[in-house]
């Protein structure tokens, strides 16, 4: 019996951070990536410079159109990903420009490791997306080599590419930082990442740790450790895994000025607020909103209370 080809389109699946998502895999039958991350759930594979198996863009377009035509419920976002790194796909610009006209209000999202943002062709394609999410697990070179095991170890070139792209991109730019215990969770690495992200127009930081079996049996951080790591990202909208949020059992009791100072240092997610604020502090949010001292900023499907 002939083996069926893996599906190009999958879902819809419900994403807490982006809503109901229909996924598109640009490399469904083979892992093709320029990283070999120790947390990757796709298995170990030698990092490559370019895709060895390339699906025709017409095949991808037809698969996406068919999936959209057969949807029984509306979706929030079409997510371009890959069994590896989607920006390695050589026809990415043609693909996104071809599918946007028939998305009918559905947002477009790409999940990337951020390593090729310095390439003009990649930048041109990424500019077409409503949301671009990239990974930045390490800036410290030793940590970068250990956690991401990249094809190219030029972290400065990667950072320069992300910085330049952020200066021309008009959509929502989201960073993902995945921390491995004893590998990239040092204070030095966290300070470097936070300082870099504060330079760019970042909409949100998704901070997480291992939650699924990985290629190298990488150790995860505890809930408390991850919460402590989030404090390095002062002033940025930080999204933690839902399990981490529910671990915050101690309710914060504070006056309105203290709450405003807290939000000024670190935007507070609307999901997190009722879990960590006592009833009086939670009521202060409405007062601060009415007095236009804070505002609600939406990033993907998550909302944050932010100071002006």
UniProtKB/Swiss-Prot annotation:
UniProt-listed InterPro entries: Aldolase_TIM, GTPase_Obg, rSAM
Cofactor binding note from Swiss-Prot or TrEMBL: Binds 1 [4Fe-4S] cluster. The cluster is coordinated with 3 cysteines and an exchangeable S-adenosyl-L-methionine.
Alphabetical keyword list: 4Fe-4S, Iron, Iron-sulfur, Metal-binding, S-adenosyl-L-methionine
Span of domain Radical SAM core: 18-248
Binding site for [4Fe-4S] cluster: 33, 37, 40
PROSITE patterns reported in the protein's UniProt record: RADICAL_SAM (PS51918)
Cofactor(s) demanded: [4Fe-4S] cluster
GO molecular function terms attached to this record: 4 iron, 4 sulfur cluster binding; catalytic activity; metal ion binding
Any one Pfam family match given in the protein's UniProt record, by short name: Radical_SAM
Annotated family: Belongs to the UPF0026 family.
Protein known as: UPF0026 protein HP_0117
Organism from which the protein derives: Helicobacter pylori (strain ATCC 700392 / 26695) (Campylobacter pylori)
């Amino acid at each position: 019996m002939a083996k069926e080809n893996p599906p190009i389109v999958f879902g819809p699946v419900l994403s807490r951070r982006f809503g109901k998502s229909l996924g598109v895999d640009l490399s469904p039958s083979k892992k093709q990536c320029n990283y070999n991350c120790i947390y990757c759930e796709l298995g170990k594979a030698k990092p490559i410079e370019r895709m060895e198996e390339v699906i025709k863009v017409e095949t991808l377009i037809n698969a996406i159109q068919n999936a959209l035509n057969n949807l029984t419920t509306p979706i929030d976002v079409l997510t371009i990903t890959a069994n590896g790194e989607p920006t390695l796909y050589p026809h990415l610009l043609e693909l996104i420009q071809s599918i946007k006209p028939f998305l009918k209000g559905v947002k477009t999202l790409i999940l990337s490791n951020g390593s090729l943002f310095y390439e003009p062709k990649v930048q041109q394609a990424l500019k077409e997306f409503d949301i671009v999410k990239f990974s930045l697990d390490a800036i410290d070179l030793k940590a970068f080599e250990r956690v991401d095991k990249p094809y190219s170890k030029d972290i400065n070139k990667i950072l320069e590419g992300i910085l330049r792209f952020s200066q021309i991109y008009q959509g929502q730019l989201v960073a993902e930082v995945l921390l491995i215990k004893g590998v990239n969770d040092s204070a030095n690495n966290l300070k470097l990442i936070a300082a870099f992200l504060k330079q760019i127009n970042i909409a949100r930081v998704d901070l997480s740790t291992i939650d699924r079996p990985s290629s190298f049996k990488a150790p995860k951080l505890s809930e408390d450790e991850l919460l402590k790591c989030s404090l390095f990202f002062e002033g940025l909208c930080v999204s933690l895994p839902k399990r981490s949020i529910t671990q915050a059992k101690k309710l914060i009791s504070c006056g309105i000025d203290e709450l405003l100072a807290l939000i000024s240092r670190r935007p507070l997610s609307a999901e997190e607020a009722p879990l960590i604020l006592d009833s009086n502090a939670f009521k202060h949010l409405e007062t601060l909103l009415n007095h236009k001292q804070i505002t609600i900023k939406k990033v993907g499907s998550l909302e944050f209370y932010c100071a002006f």
